[in-house]
Amino acid sequence: ETLANYVNAYDQKMFMKRENIADRGIWTAKKRYILNVWDSEGVRYEKPNLKMMGIEAVKSSTPAPCRKMLKDAFQILMTGTEDDMISFIDKSRAEFKTLPPEQISFPRSVSDVVKYKSPSDIYTKGTPIHCRGALLFNHYIKEKKLTNKYSLIKNGEKIKFCYLKKPNIIHENIISFIQDFPRELNLDKYIDYDLQFEKSFVEPLKAILDAI
């Protein structure tokens, strides 16, 4: 209104509102950013809140414990030191390795179980990794006669998958499951916790650090 009067405008047609006031921000790409927000739409915070858009920590495909770890890491990135970050990464890695398979596996939806199934080789060439894990799960659950305890993975199922260290007893680097990890397959000791942590925590964090 003041500006309209100053320039002697015929009619006031400029309307603005304040969205966020932040003292720090990191952009990795268009619509992918983190802001250290002190004021959001007129609401003032006693402590800054992180606003994240398009970042791994807010994606459902990231294991839940890592989403929290990443948010805490981003907070340190905004307000802490390099030594704080190194200490936090070491602490998070140690904590991650104590978690059960169900918590550190990647959540996904699977839609092509039938498409990639092979009667001779379990799965066909070019099968996506989470789908390959699903077909391997189905195969070994049937082989071990565990279908009374575990439902087979079907198209449209929400699943989790995790990487396995090789060599192992199924000669594969992946296994999927629906809700409970099938410990009867004796694969839990082969879970690659280092690779899981690298892909679900270190790589998303590195993408932010590289942008600084």
Predicted regions and their residues:
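DNA-dependent DNA polymerase catalytic subunits
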Residues: 2-212
